Amino acid sequence: MSGTKYVDSEGFLYAAPVREQGNIYKPNNKMMADELSEKAVHDVDTKEIDLVNRDPKHLNDDVVKIDFEDVIAEPEGTHSFDGIWKASFTTFTVTKYWFYRLLSAIFGIPMALIWGIYFAILSFLHIWAVVPCIRSYLIEIQCISRVYSICIHTFCDPLFEAMGKVFSSIRATVRKEI
């Protein structure tokens, strides 16, 4: 049984002592349990969802946050009856609220399924196709880049160095005539 390696006070490495009882993942041995100081492991795929704050990253703050005042407004001097204004506010708000709930009840799960499949395919292609292709390309282009670099250093560097020396002796003077 291979265990964790420990270092004693003199710096010698030794294997962890074998326990008489207890699970290897959750030891009953108090000394080892204190040393391991177990931490809760969180799986990102099985995390709890927040039913209160359903947009923690604020994805839809500027897009779908539309209230009655954002759509319908009466300027000064053109007001309808107060009862009509209150009834239209209530109608707008309740209709928007319940129609959204109806649409999400009908199409929410199928759309979640479609988007889940889409992002799974996208992740799969990125992991198993795009990144390997890019890595392969970089490996293959490395050979070409070395040949290109040698050609540049062999032919272009001396040419441009010579041109620089030729043009470095040119002096320009600016004179202002009135």
From Swiss-Prot:
GO CC aspect terms: caveola; cytoplasmic vesicle; endosome; Golgi apparatus; Golgi membrane; perinuclear region of cytoplasm
Keyword terms of this UniProt record: Cell membrane, Golgi apparatus, Lipoprotein, Membrane, Palmitate, Phosphoprotein
Metal-binding as UniProt keyword:
no
Compartment(s): Golgi apparatus membrane; Cell membrane; Membrane, Caveola; Membrane raft
Intramembrane feature ranges:
105-125
Supply the Pfam families for this chain.
Caveolin (PF01146)
Write out the GO biological process terms.
Answer: caveola assembly; cell differentiation; negative regulation of endothelial cell proliferation; regulation of cytosolic calcium ion concentration; T cell costimulation
Task: Please report which positions carry a covalently bound lipid of kind S-palmitoyl cysteine.
Answer: C133, C143, C156
Post-translational changes noted in the entry: Phosphorylated on tyrosine residue(s).
User: Primary place of residence?
Assistant: Golgi
Record-level Gene Ontology MF annotations: molecular adaptor activity; protein kinase binding; transmembrane transporter binding
Tell me if Membrane is a UniProt keyword of this record: yes
* InterPro entries reported in the protein's UniProt record: Caveolin (IPR001612), Caveolin_CS (IPR018361)
Origin, by domain of life?
A: Eukaryota
* Residues in compartment: Cytoplasmic: 1-104, 126-178
Query: What topology does it adopt in the membrane?
Result: Peripheral membrane protein
Oligomeric state and partners?
Homooligomer.
Q: What does this protein do?
A: May act as a positive regulator of T-cell coactivation. May act as a scaffolding protein within caveolar membranes. Interacts directly with G-protein alpha subunits and can functionally regulate their activity.
Similarity annotation: Belongs to the caveolin family.
Which protein is depicted?
Answer: Caveolin-1
Record the organism. Answer: Gallus gallus
